[in-house]
């Protein structure tokens, strides 16, 4: 396993998403329905208040909505040597500092913690520190992405062209 040459200067880089993500009440409800989470604090303000929250509470995996956008920006911004069309999540960890609530403005500070290439496959670890409008921590997310090395596709195209010319 090695760090790809084009990624060596990227390790430790920081990216701040240019805008915040506003958590909407209806988005929380829609997401809860989509993931079949029927907890009443996702749907009813009175139930959320009875549980001690000032607004609807987002399901635990709600961060995936905004996080996916930030991840795609990271691959473009850092020019990670990975074929983005052939990438999947290998692992994801969340550390919740507090629940995500309706009307939260979430800000993403994202770091490329590691990039490793082995046998035409790239493993990239991306960490996002998510904060609210006051700069207080909400969630820390660490995602490990696994994908085909970007240059691998070029080799594949050359191989296909060579075979086609026979």
UniProtKB/Swiss-Prot annotation:
It comes from Mycobacterium tuberculosis (strain ATCC 25618 / H37Rv). This is UPF0336 protein Rv0504c. Signal peptide: none annotated. The modification N-acetylthreonine is found at residue 2. It comes from the Bacteria. Residues 8-131 form the MaoC-like domain. GO terms for cellular component: peptidoglycan-based cell wall; plasma membrane. One of its GO terms (molecular function) is (3R)-hydroxyacyl-[acyl-carrier-protein] dehydratase activity. Keywords: Acetylation. PANTHER family: HYDROXYACYL-THIOESTER DEHYDRATASE TYPE 2, MITOCHONDRIAL, HYDROXYACYL-THIOESTER DEHYDRATASE TYPE 2, MITOCHONDRIAL-RELATED. The keyword ATP-binding does not apply. Gene3D superfamilies: Hotdog Thioesterase.
